[in-house]
From Swiss-Prot:
<dbReference type="GO" id="GO:0045333">
    <property type="term" value="P:cellular respiration"/>
</dbReference>
<feature type="transmembrane region" description="Helical">
    <location>
        <begin position="75"/>
        <end position="102"/>
    </location>
</feature>
<keyword id="KW-0679">Respiratory chain</keyword>
<keyword id="KW-1278">Translocase</keyword>
<keyword id="KW-1133">Transmembrane helix</keyword>
<feature type="binding site">
    <location>
        <position position="16"/>
    </location>
    <ligand>
        <name>a ubiquinone</name>
    </ligand>
</feature>
<dbReference type="GO" id="GO:0045275">
    <property type="term" value="C:respiratory chain complex III"/>
</dbReference>
<feature type="transmembrane region" description="Helical">
    <location>
        <begin position="173"/>
        <end position="204"/>
    </location>
</feature>
<dbReference type="InterPro" id="IPR030689">
    <property type="entry name" value="Cytochrome_b"/>
</dbReference>
<comment type="similarity">
    <text>Belongs to the cytochrome b family.</text>
</comment>
<comment type="subunit">
    <text>Component of the ubiquinol-cytochrome c oxidoreductase (cytochrome b-c1 complex, complex III, CIII), a multisubunit enzyme composed of 10 subunits. The complex is composed of 3 respiratory subunits cytochrome b (COB), cytochrome c1 (CYT1) and Rieske protein (RIP1), 2 core protein subunits COR1 and QCR2, and 5 low-molecular weight protein subunits QCR6, QCR7, QCR8, QCR9 and QCR10.</text>
</comment>
<feature type="transmembrane region" description="Helical">
    <location>
        <begin position="111"/>
        <end position="135"/>
    </location>
</feature>
<keyword id="KW-0999">Mitochondrion inner membrane</keyword>
<keyword id="KW-0249">Electron transport</keyword>
<feature type="binding site">
    <location>
        <position position="202"/>
    </location>
    <ligand>
        <name>a ubiquinone</name>
    </ligand>
</feature>
<dbReference type="GO" id="GO:0009060">
    <property type="term" value="P:aerobic respiration"/>
</dbReference>
<dbReference type="GO" id="GO:0006122">
    <property type="term" value="P:mitochondrial electron transport, ubiquinol to cytochrome c"/>
</dbReference>
Length: 385
């Protein structure tokens, strides 16, 4: 027996990335998982090295980031890799989730796999927000103020929760210090959840574009899919390097190069681009409490998909109606992101409300109705044969 199979530790590696049987029909959309693993490693490694030079004291936080940029050897590469790496992390994560939605990866028997993925998504959003606050520029300070103030919408105990989060009466030194501590901790929790994600994947294996069982035609992970993954890894590294070295601030906000000042409110307070769709959903509801509930529901609604999709066929590969409404949903999500970056004024308020309705309607109305209609059409087509 090969040593990689007999050794208790290497046998785990072997069963996941060497001899793991994969459906022969999977396409490049299945490469997003390996890219997400690469992104997580980049973020953790660059974050650890940056933490060696960063100070979480509110008087020193902004200056310590500039110290990393100016004085630390290759510090600017660390900072720009970390900042742009976060944006690319979310780009790939959105594509990974879109693949799951399109190909029905949330369907039984992979419901646990999907649910763990949603938890990873929530933890990643929290980590990104905490890290954005650690820079303590203008947008960091006011972003922290706005988002933490959302908890004040909770009846009776909301204001106490906000004061507890702040560690005082406003965003101050205790806030940034505890945010940094959590920002350092949560990525390791994400790494643990990724291991759980892989364990859940290993039970039933990967799905495939055809939506049928792949047990009849599987090939080993190595060397076929390892080299296939390397194609997108090198392409990803090339595009990331172009941003890091030639356009490092394109995905950021210029106001965050101004030290945080609680006495000066920016013209517009917007989060990073990857949180804009959920920010638009929050702002589309006039009532504060309902807005907060709706924003969190926009993420948690992903958990109901395994139950609202009633189709007898997994995925949208052979379903024309489902394809059409899926791309409507994608367009609507991009539109929400654009609206989230706009001021709260006519016509963006009404557009945001319509887009929010379409977002929830897709999961709760469109998917169950269309899947039922397609089931009837499949049945009619089979009977007529």
């Amino acid at each position: 027996m090969a040593f990689r199979k007999s050794n208790v530790y290497l046998s785990l590696v072997n069963s996941y990335i060497i001899d793991s049987p994969q459906p022969s029909s999977i396409n490049y959309w299945w490469n997003m998982g390996s890219l997400l693993g690469l992104c997580l490693v980049i973020q953790i490694v660059t974050g650890i090295f940056m933490a060696m030079h960063y100070s979480s004291n509110i008087e020193l936080a902004f200056s310590s980031v500039e110290h990393i940029m100016r004085d630390v050897h290759n510090g600017y590469i660390l900072r720009y890799l970390h900042a742009n790496g976060a944006s690319f992390f979310f780009m790939v994560m959105f594509m990974h989730m879109a693949k799951g939605l399109y190909y029905g990866s949330y369907r039984s028997p992979r419901v646990t796999l999907w649910n763990v993925g949603v938890i990873i998504f929530i933890l990643t959003i929290a980590t990104a927000f905490l890290g954005y606050c650690c820079v303590y520029g203008q947008m960091s300070h006011w972003g922290a103020t706005v988002i933490t103030n959302l908890f004040s919408a909770i009846p009776f105990v909301g204001n106490d929760i906000v004061s507890w989060l702040w560690g005082g009466f406003s965003v101050s030194n205790p806030t940034i210090q505890r945010f940094f501590a959590l920002h350092y901790l949560v990525p390791f929790i994400i790494a643990a959840m990724v291991i759980m994600h892989l364990m859940a994947l290993h039970i039933h294996g990967s799905s495939n574009p055809l939506g049928i069982t792949g047990n009849l035609d599987r090939i080993p992970m190595h060397s076929y899919f390892i080299f296939k993954d390397l194609v997108t890894v090198f392409l990803f590294m090339l595009i990331l390097a172009l941003f890091v070295f030639y356009s490092p601030n394109t995905l950021g906000h210029p106001d965050n190069y101004i030290p945080g000042n609680p006495l000066v409110t920016p013209a517009s307070i917007v989060p990073e681009w990857y949180l804009l769709p959920f920010y638009a959903i929050l702002r589309s509801i006039p009532d504060k409490l309902l807005g907060v509930i709706t924003m969190f529901a926009a993420i948690l609604v992903l958990l109901v998909l395994p139950f609202t999709d009633r189709s007898v066929v997994r995925g949208n590969t052979f379903k024309v109606l489902s394809k059409f409404f899926f791309f409507i949903f994608v367009f609507n999500f991009v539109l929400l992101g654009q609206i989230g970056a706009c001021h709260v004024e006519v016509p963006y308020v009404l557009m945001g409300q319509i887009a929010t309705f379409i977002y929830f309607a897709y999961f709760l109305i469109i998917v169950p109705v269309i899947s039922t209609i397609e089931n009837v059409l499949f049945y009619i087509g089979r009977v007529n044969k």
